[in-house]
Structure formats: structure tokens, C-alpha cells
Amino acid sequence: MQKFVLKFLWLQRSVAVSLDQKIGDNVSPLTEFYFWPQCDAWEEMRNFLESKSWINSSESILLLNQVTEIINDWQEKDDSQRKDIFDLKEKFPFVDFIGFD
């Protein structure tokens, strides 16, 4: 069972990520949205994960790798490619894309 959920806003000019924790059937937000490229969303997420002793290093690495993959995917696409939401959800099934423009 997945313990954490990454949520993404997939926008034309930026991508944003937040982290939620799953507890049973409930989901509780742990972070605000960190926007990239306005700030270093990856670094902000890393700082958050490192500050929580109850999140182990293997979970942190997995989450940060997923953030890296999605930010890289966003960077590699032009504006028209960023609109292909179905491809995105297929490529990254373990994260939630909750907003698009």
C-alpha cells in the first residue's frame, strides 16, 4: 500500500508538486505546492523530506526520483505536448495530476 501521494499541477508555464500522506482511506496534506521553475521545487521537497525523521531515506529517494522524472518530462515537452493529459497519466500512474491549464 502506498504511504505517500505526490500531487501535481501540470501548467503551461510551470509544474507544481505537493505531498500527501495516506492513512487508511484518508489523505492528509503534508506540504504546500512547490512550483518549478519559479523556485526549485525539487530542493524544497528534499528539504521537507529531510526535516521529517519519520520519513525514511528509501521513501525520500523514491519520492524525489518521481519528482525528478516528472519535472524532466515537463521540461522536455513544448506547449502543445503538455496538453496530452492521457499520455501523462499512463506514463506516471502512481502520482495524481489534479490540475491543468
From Swiss-Prot:
Query: Which Pfam families does UniProt cross-reference here?
Result: PSRP-3_Ycf65
- From the Swiss-Prot or TrEMBL record, what is one GO molecular function term? structural constituent of ribosome
Q: Which InterPro entries match?
A: PSRP-3/Ycf65_sf, Ribosomal_PSRP3/Ycf65
The primary location reported for this protein is: plastid
User: What is one process in the GO biological process aspect for this record?
Assistant: translation
From the Swiss-Prot or TrEMBL record, state where the protein is found. Plastid, Chloroplast
Q: Name one GO cellular component term.
A: ribonucleoprotein complex
Keyword Ribonucleoprotein attributed: yes
Q: Which UniProt keywords apply?
A: Chloroplast, Plastid, Ribonucleoprotein, Ribosomal protein
Cell membrane as UniProt keyword: no
What HAMAP family does this protein's entry cite?
Ribosomal_plastid_cS23 (MF_00619)
Q: Which family does it belong to?
A: Belongs to the chloroplast-specific ribosomal protein cS23 family.
Q: Which PANTHER family match?
A: 30S RIBOSOMAL PROTEIN 3, CHLOROPLASTIC (PTHR35108), OS04G0461100 PROTEIN (PTHR35108:SF1)
Q: How does it assemble?
A: Part of the 30S ribosomal subunit.
Summarizing the function annotation, the protein's role is: Probably a ribosomal protein or a ribosome-associated protein.
Protein name as catalogued: Small ribosomal subunit protein cS23
Per the UniProt entry, what species is this protein from, by scientific name? Euglena viridis
